[in-house]
Amino acid sequence: RSMLDDVSSLHFATKFDANENLSIGLARYNQAGASHNYQGAGSPLPGFSAVGPSTELSINALAVLGRYSMDDFSAIGGIKISTVADATADIFKLSGAATAASIEGGSDTGLVAGVAYEKPEIALRVELVYETEASFSLPTTGGLLGAATANTTASVPDYRTLNFQSGIAEDTLLYGSIRQADWSNHQVAVAPQTQAAPTSDFSDSTTYTIGVGRKISDQWSITASYKTEEATENTGTSLLSPTDGYEAIGAAAIYTLENGTEITVGVNYSMVGDKTVTSSGVSGLYSDNTVVTSGIKVAYNF
């Protein structure tokens, strides 16, 4: 059985044109999270099946964005509220804790800014977006704290994303993105640990995506994509960071109804990078692991 639990999330977004130059949008989505359960999972670390860590953490974002167009150029700006849901972290059994740490949720507000260039006659769009970091200080009880209270610290890094798309033939679109985040400076430290000895062991990431879309008919379109995140650290010390980069392939089909509603069904297959984790004096190799994700999107244009 996998030490990674199944995860489901619900996203929504809406956009409307205030006038011919200004558009306003609202989006809610899952920004980050961790869902691990080594207990009974057959961990490669000897003896950890009974006392290994179990965590459940989710960070959701609510973004309000505006876009102002000036001929072929546009400016993007807005705010993003990142919220950590109430969480649990059963990670101190090896240190003698009888209960899991209970972490109270919290939120932080950041900014989003970007610019874009468009050439509609060839479906060209190039967009550069910057998102500021979010930091959290979350009251925590249980675990090694017992009835006492201390703060768990966590943060989500600033993101720099370059998106592009362009028509390359009739009814055929090439698209892609590059996304960077300095995760090495944004660790999770479940109280009573500190950022000097964090719970996590995240590494900086650069993610590349390339894909192609094809319109088959007035009703049907298909897409295929390849995504990769560079491997940076094939060894680590945190059981919450058991992978090192990944490669993924994805495919989707889009069906458009007569009223303009679009229904998209997609699947993604990821091959995550191998990593050796050393914790409490023993080492385990995580290798040949895969992740399958699927999703359904419904969009209505009016």
Segments from the language model and where they lie:
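Surface-exposed strand-loop-strand hairpins of Gram-negative outer-membrane beta-barrel proteins
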Residues: 1-5
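Outer-membrane beta-barrel porins/channels
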Residues: 7-9, 15-302
